[in-house]
Design a protein with these regions (language model features):
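Sec-dependent signal peptide recognition
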Residues: 2-11
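Hydrophobic alpha-helical targeting segments used for export or membrane insertion
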Residues: 10-18
Length: 157
């Protein structure tokens, strides 16, 4: 009798578990989708909230875009090209007035000096790791630590 009751309880539990929907990402995090304008191929590889409320997004293809009012109506978000021609940027972070971008071969400091919304000053902050050109080599950056330092994680083959 006890074995039958145990089996019945186990079967009922398994049936309930099967009936429950598999969890999805939105069960844990709020997901906001931003419509990407025609002509932009977005392979998002880094995001950073800027002090002025814009959202900086970099693409693995080498562009950085600024999105205005990212918390507003998604259909009214304006995209503007901030920088282009970067080498597989995989991180963005803002620190001390500079937008830092970790590219395949360097950590770059980027700034819009003349205030026109486009980056016009690019400075190498660090490039001490070197690359061979192998397609599996990537550099991933972190947010600045307590000392303001960025740590670079390398995938070298």
């Amino acid at each position: 009798m006890i074995k039958q009751l145990t089996r019945l309880t186990l079967l009922a539990g398994l049936a309930l578990a099967q009936a429950a929907a598999d969890p999805v990402e939105s069960d844990y995090y709020k997901i906001d989708a931003f419509p990407v304008p025609d002509g932009i191929v977005m392979e998002t590889s880094g995001i950073e909230m800027m002090p002025d409320g814009k959202l900086a997004i970099c693409s693995r293809r080498g562009d950085i875009y600024m999105l205005s009012n990212p918390y507003g109506d998604p259909s009214k978000i304006e995209w503007s090209l901030y920088a282009e021609g970067l080498h597989e940027p995989l991180n963005l972070s803002f620190n001390d007035g500079w937008l830092y971008c970790t590219q395949r071969g360097e950590l770059t400091q980027i700034k819009d000096v003349d205030g026109d919304g486009r980056a016009d000053l690019f400075q190498t902050a660090n490039d001490g790791w070197g690359i061979t050109g192998d397609y599996h080599e990537y550099a991933f950056g972190t947010r600045p630590d307590a000392n303001g330092d960025t740590w670079i994680v390398l995938c070298l083959t």
